[in-house]
Every structure is written in structure tokens, then in C-alpha cells.
Design a protein with these regions (language model features):
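Metal-dependent phosphohydrolase cores
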Residues: 1-240
Length: 240
């Protein structure tokens, strides 16, 4: 029996322009992640991300677009290739936050340092490491993936990680996170502000930033879905 994440992926493949060989390459990377119970849960209507598009569908769209961009980059840059697997992993992990954000009981503001928009990349890093530890065994790869996830919202800021008491929904995971020191380093800057604004260091992370913006623009197709980005409330969706 196919999982809902497979049905979403195979439907998106139809208009992706990918060859059968490319689809197989992508699926080999994505399968262990999109089959995980936590990912499958995020493919339901209970996890709307942009408008009524489920979080799982959004992530898969981002990952396919990132894959396409990485292939194009590799074809046109002879001296510096993009690591396609790492790029796709960053895309598959970047929004694995803990709780749905639209119409939640938590008050939100685009100007609040602890709002979902500024903290969800941190939650995504911790959840990805907790659910998929094998992809973080190599320190160099882990740092590229973490940095790509953390800064995927650029030019929107991310919350600085100054200590283990920041307000996030999976804070307990922060206390035992192997790469906690790197998390501090990658969100650090010389200002006194509690936010960091910069793009990912790697080309793989930068490709996701581009893919994410393109996909988000196609999903934010109503006034209410756009307004939700500011106040967290989407009147077009049923109240949780």
C-alpha cells in the first residue's frame, strides 16, 4: 500500500519534467525520509503550511525544485559542482517543525523574536537530527545541512541560539544536540539583536532558498494565506 507521501510525490512527478532516471535518483534520496511516520503525519490537512497546502506537500515540492536547480547548476558550473544529495536533504529537512502554525492558540507576530517564522528552522534542525541521525554522522555534511536549514528563510531572519533556554516547541532536544556549538556559531553575529540575517554558506543551501521562494509564491494564492504570514491566522481554514 502506497503511503500518502508517495502519492503526493508521484503526482508531482507528472509535471516535474524529470526523466524516469532522474525520478529514480530523487526517490532513492527521498524515500527514507518521506516514509517516516513524522513526515507522513505532515502530509495531512492537519498540517497546513501555505494556505491549504500541507506541510509535507510543500516540502516535497521544494525538494523537487531544489533537485532541478542543483542539476542545472552542476551542468553549468564546471569548477564547482553542487552536491545533489545534500541539496535535496536540506530541502527535505528545512521545514520539519514541531506544531502546525496556522490558527494555533499561540499568539504570533512577524516582529517577535520567538515567532514561528524565526524559530521554526531551529526546530527543523533538531527534529531532523532526532528522526534521521544517520545523515548527520559526517561532521562536514552535518554542518552544511544545519546551516542550510537554519538560513533557508533568507532574507527573513532566524532567531539567534544564545543558550539552551530559547523558546521553541522541542526545547528538550536542544539540550542533547550533538552540534549545539555549531548552532550557536551559525546564528551568531556582532550585533546585540536576537536575530541573524544572512544566506546559507553553501551553494546547496542557497539553491533551497531560491526553490523555497518560488514554491511559496505559487502556494500563497489568497489574501488570507498571505495575511497568515503576519498574524498566524488564516480565516480560510477551519479553526483548530
Amino acid at each position: 500500500m502506497k503511503k500518502v507521501s508517495d502519492r503526493i510525490l508521484f503526482n508531482l512527478f507528472l509535471n516535474s519534467g524529470l526523466t524516469i532516471t532522474e525520478q529514480k535518483e530523487f526517490y532513492k534520496i527521498a524515500k527514507p525520509i518521506i516514509h517516516h511516520k513524522e513526515f507522513v503525519k505532515r502530509c495531512s490537512k492537519d498540517f497546513p503550511h501555505h494556505g491549504s497546502t500541507s506541510l509535507g506537500e510543500h516540502i516535497i515540492k521544494d525538494a523537487i525544485k531544489t533537485y532541478v536547480l542543483a542539476k542545472e547548476y552542476t551542468k553549468t558550473h564546471f569548477l564547482k559542482k553542487a552536491d545533489i544529495k545534500i541539496a535535496v536533504l536540506i530541502a527535505l529537512f528545512h521545514d520539519l517543525y514541531t506544531k502546525p502554525w496556522q490558527n494555533s492558540d499561540e499568539k504570533t507576530s512577524v516582529f517577535n523574536n520567538d515567532t514561528h517564522g524565526m524559530t521554526h528552522p531551529i526546530e527543523a534542525v533538531l527534529n531532523s537530527y532526532n528522526w534521521f541521525p544517520k545523515y548527520f554522522k559526517n561532521e562536514k555534511d552535518a554542518e552544511i545541512i544545519i546551516d542550510g536549514i537554519i538560513h533557508h528563510m533568507y532574507p527573513y531572519p532566524v532567531r539567534k541560539v544564545e543558550n539552551k533556554n530559547i523558546k521553541i516547541n522541542n526545547q528538550k532536544l536542544l539540550k542533547k544536540f550533538k552540534y549545539y556549538d555549531y548552532l550557536i556559531q551559525t546564528t551568531k553575529n556582532i550585533t546585540k539583536l536576537k536575530i541573524d540575517i544572512r544566506p546559507p554558506k553553501s551553494i546547496e543551501g542557497k539553491l533551497l532558498v531560491k526553490a523555497d521562494k518560488l514554491i511559496a509564491l505559487s502556494e500563497l494564492n489568497s489574501f488570507n494565506s498571505i495575511k497568515a504570514l503576519v498574524n498566524g491566522t488564516n480565516k480560510s481554514l477551519a479553526k483548530k
